Amino acid sequence: MGIRAIVVDTAGTTTDLNFIQDVLFPYSVKALPDFLEQNQHNVLVENCICDTKDIALEPEADLARVTEILQQWVNEDRKATPLKTLQGLIWKQGYAHGEFKGHIFPDFIEAVKRFSTQNLRIYSFSSGSVDAQKLLFSHSDGGDLTEMFNGHFDTRTGNKLDKQAYCNILNTISLSPKQVLFVSDVIEELKAADAAGMMTCQMVRDSKQRTGDFRKISSFDELQIE
């Protein structure tokens, strides 16, 4: 049967975690107050504000309080969908203004080109929104990589720690579990993918990283698909 598709995690796998934590997250925290003030009547932003109030159980929260809640969620690394949607919108402005470029590990840039020539389908699965993933890969320091991808998945597909999210991905891409390889640095994500029947591989870029009973690589250079 063989592997026909590869699903990659982003932070810690294709992208340096420090870029997310030290560049993207602080940028969104700083930009949130002005962004919400200027765009609060945009339908998408308005929906995110309402969803934030619902999740926080604060239906009467004013805009300042909503901003405070969202900034707190960033600091807690909460995977709440309204936060991730707003971050994607904010980062879109940052990329457009040249504030930063998306960091992608060079070995992944080379590997994704190699996988494309092997007719392997490539997908990304991240807690960041699909739009944020597209921005990361289209404004990467290795150029625009979006044409190399067949699709992207985010929290709307499910929690990355839940088996069902990976079952949903399999249903969407219409492949059997053993035809799909999931690559991530996070043990709990790999366990969930394994429970869904997917093939798995742990990316270990840091020697201090927690490792589990999975096939391991330290670079995409080591990932050979026959």
From Swiss-Prot:
Keywords assigned by UniProt, alphabetized: Amino-acid biosynthesis, Hydrolase, Magnesium, Metal-binding, Methionine biosynthesis
GO MF term set: 2,3-diketo-5-methylthiopentyl-1-phosphate enolase activity; 2-hydroxy-3-keto-5-methylthiopentenyl-1-phosphate phosphatase activity; acireductone synthase activity; magnesium ion binding
UniProt key word Hydrolase: yes
GO terms, biological process: L-methionine salvage from methylthioadenosine
Which domain of life, per UniProt? Bacteria
Quote the cofactor binding remark: Binds 1 Mg(2+) ion per subunit.
Enzyme Commission designation? 3.1.3.77
Q: Name one Pfam family in it.
A: Hydrolase
Q: In which pathway does it act?
A: Amino-acid biosynthesis; L-methionine biosynthesis via salvage pathway; L-methionine from S-methyl-5-thio-alpha-D-ribose 1-phosphate: step 3/6; Amino-acid biosynthesis; L-methionine biosynthesis via salvage pathway; L-methionine from S-methyl-5-thio-alpha-D-ribose 1-phosphate: step 4/6
Annotated catalysed reactions: 5-methylsulfanyl-2,3-dioxopentyl phosphate + H2O = 1,2-dihydroxy-5-(methylsulfanyl)pent-1-en-3-one + phosphate
Q: Which cofactor does it need?
A: Mg(2+)
Q: Which InterPro entries match?
A: Enolase-ppase_E1, HAD-like_sf, HAD-SF_hydro_IA, HAD_sf
Family assignment from sequence similarity? Belongs to the HAD-like hydrolase superfamily. MasA/MtnC family.
Known partners and oligomeric status? Monomer.
Q: What does this protein do?
A: Bifunctional enzyme that catalyzes the enolization of 2,3-diketo-5-methylthiopentyl-1-phosphate (DK-MTP-1-P) into the intermediate 2-hydroxy-3-keto-5-methylthiopentenyl-1-phosphate (HK-MTPenyl-1-P), which is then dephosphorylated to form the acireductone 1,2-dihydroxy-3-keto-5-methylthiopentene (DHK-MTPene).
HAMAP family hit by this protein? Salvage_MtnC (MF_01681)
Q: What is this protein called?
A: Enolase-phosphatase E1
Organism, per UniProt? Shewanella putrefaciens (strain CN-32 / ATCC BAA-453)
Q: What gene is this protein translated from? A: mtnC
